[in-house]
Amino acid sequence: MKIAHLSDPHLTSLDPVRWRELLNKRILGYLSWRLRRRRAHSREILSRTLAHLAGQQPDHLVISGDLTHLGAASECREAETWLNRIGAPDYISIVPGNHDRYIAADPEQTLGRWRAYMQSDPDAAARGPQFPYLRVRGPVALIGLSSAVPTPPFYASGRLGEEQLQHLSHLLEATAQQGLYRIVTLHHSPHSMSSRRGLSDAGALLSTLAGPGAELVIHGHGHRQMQATLQAGARRIPVFG
């Protein structure tokens, strides 16, 4: 089973965004994009990356968030078109990033457009809210978490919340009993970071993972490739970002 991981493509353009959509925290992100980010995130490089991945013939693609810059409706439509072009929902699993929920917004016009790519299999053991979701592909259990929450200006932190962590624990236990290789995906790093950029309940996530465990955790957010180990109680869990 070969799984590809892509994160933080920031693939959208902000040219269609209306000025009235920027009369909030988004204006800071817009200025960052206008002055710097639009040159840092190249569609050509993304296209080459996807072509390389296609050559590797992965069985599944996981995208760990930040498809957009500001989570605006026009961006989410553009990202939806891009997702539909590169693969079907049963081939691609995504979780949202902090840029995808930059501010509180109508989910039907924003993240809801990607729902088919971040929902449980129809017969999965997942019950309750959308996250965490469970998708089983061969011997692998793909468990997707959402750490994306609206934050104040100059903050890019994330949070999972008690309810999501409780459901995560149940899914990890159920899939362990099935003998599946469990991959947990979220946008923010599970390691401790600054309060401005980190996962606020990273400690609670560690406690959850310390029980049933997981075989692998993958994340994005840092805009750099990394490989580490997460110490969750007596367990050492590989982490790729």
Where are these regions (language model features)?
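Short coil/turn segments at beta-strand junctions that form active-site/ligand-binding loops
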Residues: 1, 57-59, 90-91, 178-181, ...
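N-terminal active-site segment of His-dependent metallophosphoesterases
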Residues: 1-78
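Active-site environment of divalent metal-dependent phosphoester hydrolases
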Residues: 10-14, 69-72, 98-106, 150-154, ...
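Conserved beta-sheet core of the metallophosphoesterase superfamily
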Residues: 84, 196-241
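Divalent metal-coordination and catalytic microenvironments
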Residues: 8, 61, 66, 79, ...
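Extended active-site neighborhood of metal-dependent phosphoesterases/phosphodiesterases
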Residues: 77-167, 207-210, 233-235
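Beta-strand-turn-beta hairpins that frame and shape the catalytic cleft
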Residues: 1-4, 133-144, 176-181, 230-238
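Short acidic, glycine-rich surface-loop motifs adjacent to enzyme active sites
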Residues: 172-193
